[in-house]
Amino acid sequence: MAVTKIYIVYYSLHGHVETMAREVLRGVNSVPDVEATLWQVPETLPEKILEKVKAVPRPDDVPDIRPEQLAEADGFMFGFPSRFGVMASQVMTFFDNTNDLWTTQALAGKPAGIFWSTGFHGGGQELTALTAVTKLAHHGMIFVPVGYTFGKSMYEMGEVKGGSPYGSGTYAADGSREPTELEIQQANYHGKYFAGIAKKLKKRSPV
């Protein structure tokens, strides 16, 4: 059986989304005949600003991705922090540079999922996801939400938990809060669930 290639493309300023991305990677790679690759969205902020906001160093083992490289994959998981209810400007800029792919609809019919980090309740856990879907729609990609398939943990009220039916998520608070065990579990499940859907779509594709 042909391998289904999933690109996990993320941007992380303080490390929270990176943590989620690596767990999504484990989930995707747990599905037979599916292979995931981690990619970073290029940074757009100058070093002086990054130092001021105490950005964590970018990992050396995850290369930056160029827009045209998206065409190589069978599906995508995009991860990003929220800024004022939308994806961070670095990810916005990356999508703005996919015009050539949009012109040819090179990504049409390919599945895509999303995961994210916000500061607090009301910081965009669902709004960020909803606004991100517009990028996928204009490319003709198939949005794959996680729904409530994660089970009873989706209804957890005993602790703070990010994520929603749109995808997995976490809260960063002032930057000191790290993804919880439950959020990590959901990210892993999300990757596994998405990989299963992407694999089915590739198998049924006439191309």
UniProtKB/Swiss-Prot annotation:
Binds 1 FMN per monomer. Pfam families: FMN_red (PF03358). Its cofactor is FMN. FMN binds at residues 12-16, 114-167. One of its GO terms (cellular component) is plastid. NCBIfam families: flav_wrbA (TIGR01755), PRK03767.1 (NF002999). This is Probable NAD(P)H dehydrogenase (quinone) FQR1-like 3. It comes from Arabidopsis thaliana (Mouse-ear cress).
